[in-house]
Amino acid sequence: MIFQRTVKEMVKTTGVGLHSGNKVTLIIKPAPVNTGIKLVRTDLSPAVEIPAVADQVRETTMCTALVNDDGVRISTIEHLFAALAGLGIDNAVIEVDAPEIPIMDGSASPFVFLLQSVGIQEQNAAKKYIKITKPIRVEDGDKWAELKPFKGFRVDFAIDFNHPEIARSQQHMVMDFSSSAFIKDISRARTFGFMRDIEYLRANNLALGGSMENAVVLDEYRVLNPDGLRYEDEFVKHKILDAFGDLYVAGHAIVGEFCAYKTGHALNNQLVRAMLAQQDAWEIVSFEKEADAPVSFSVPAGAVFA
């Protein structure tokens, strides 16, 4: 059987909030089977829990933010969620003492390291997958995103930026998902932004924590970071990383093909909502034999049932 997963023990880190520029403490705790991913604002009294589900995503400008009915928010969840999805973690409680997840280095890699440092524990319940049985598509002008039936999880993603540095890079990528492919090829890709936008955002009290330490920064012609890019195609890879995180608010790993052109957080969430609403287009499945599982996650060392 393919089992559900959580972290073996609590793990804690600190970082900077992208928009506030303030110090943020993040704690990831194990959770029982069928908990899903829950986020908790511990800086509020009493603490406020926000479930990581698609209809709680109520802000998608520059990041993915969960917002409850009282307006309590947790922003910039997508890189952490990409790491959780990439390592196949089904159940966890995420505590944060600020309105945003720390940006770390602008990629998912620090979260992958954090999760791997404490280990992943298999639990005594079957892992659930969302298997796509009919195509679901959403569009916004020339942008579109689609989920289609596929035995596995494949991503076919294209971006189109009219910028000389990005245009020189590969702007289209197809990959068959596995934990190892995610960690090696996707997880280190950083968010990117343009100097002109950063100046405007800072003037409006946003992106106060943004820097070349946690983003690829471009002017009109080139990358400004002294160390350059981590991957030649880092731009499209980061958009894929974002999509992994955005799709994980569906609640389970997806068995299907995700195809997208020029999508961002808003359209990714729109696609998840459209999928969940179209209940004849998917089904929940589990797999008795590992050989039958179409999506490959890294095997935790010395897995112990919880």
Curated annotation (Swiss-Prot):
Task: Cite a single GO MF annotation.
Answer: UDP-3-O-acyl-N-acetylglucosamine deacetylase activity
Please give the cofactor(s) recorded in the UniProt entry for this protein: Zn(2+)
- InterPro entries in the cross-refs: Ribosomal_Su5_D2-typ_SF (IPR020568), UDP-acyl_GlcNac_deAcase (IPR004463), UDP-acyl_GlcNac_deAcase_C (IPR011334), UDP-acyl_N-AcGlcN_deAcase_N (IPR015870)
Q: Which residues bind Zn(2+)?
A: H79, H238, D242
Entry EC no(s) = 3.5.1.108
Q: Please give the biological process terms from Gene Ontology that the record holds.
A: lipid A biosynthetic process
Gene3D superfamilies assigned to the protein according to its UniProt record, in alphabetical order? lpxc deacetylase, domain 1 (3.30.230.20), lpxc deacetylase, domain 2 (3.30.1700.10)
Alphabetically sorted, this entry's keywords are:
Hydrolase, Lipid A biosynthesis, Lipid biosynthesis, Lipid metabolism, Metal-binding, Zinc
Q: Where is the active site?
A: H265 (proton donor)
Pfam families membership: LpxC (PF03331)
What is its EC class?
hydrolase
**HAMAP family noted in UniProt:** LpxC
User: What task does this protein carry out?
Assistant: Catalyzes the hydrolysis of UDP-3-O-myristoyl-N-acetylglucosamine to form UDP-3-O-myristoylglucosamine and acetate, the committed step in lipid A biosynthesis.
Protein name from the UniProt record = UDP-3-O-acyl-N-acetylglucosamine deacetylase
Question: What is the native source organism of this protein?
Answer: Shewanella pealeana (strain ATCC 700345 / ANG-SQ1)
Instruction: Give the classification, highest ranks.
Output: Bacteria, Pseudomonadati, Pseudomonadota, Gammaproteobacteria, Alteromonadales
